[in-house]
Amino acid sequence: EKGRENLLLQSNQFDTTWGLEATTLTSGQTGYDGSSDAWKVIPITDNSTHYVYKTTPYQTGVSTFSVYAKYSGYHAQLRVFNIGGGKAYANFDLQNGTKGTSGGTDIIDSTITSVGNGWYRITLSLNYTIAPYSSGVIPIESPTDGEIPSYAGDGTSGVLIQDFQHEVGLVATGYIETTTAAVQKGILENLPRIDYSGGASCPSLLLEPQRTNLF
């Protein structure tokens, strides 16, 4: 298995170290995986911008952000931003499973994939060029809305979200849950495989001398 890592902490605990802007959260929603681990992000009735966000670690090069989302009165915008402006955003139509408006100075691509029962995995890929960044989900009224729109919510409708991930690379891989630290799976780059036993009771490295046949 190729090495993978979710760099975003508290990846499905949006009531911990995540920031809320003019929104409320309701936990215990039915998730894409049949669990009750999804969250409903509900815009409040103030005429404002509404989103849930988190600062992400700096990684030079290409990064991909992903989250599972479902329509519950609003569509979704994935956004990655820095002090002074957005770096990438993409809108997603959660009723029809299509991409909407997107933009930003560092955007590469976005995708939406159905996972059943009205749930979609939405992704946003971009070039990391400056630190620090924040990433988040914004409930939007229309897939054609601009970046981080302002409006007054009804206090009831929202968007369901579950399992946020930030990883290095252009493709969103299988979700890895995190709490207070990043979590790695598979064989990571620049790390040796320590899985040779040779009769030993614990994993070890097999080292052999290099030989050359001169005939």
Give the location of each predicted region.
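Extracellular and organelle-lumenal recognition/adhesion modules and their flexible linkers in secreted
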Residues: E1-F215
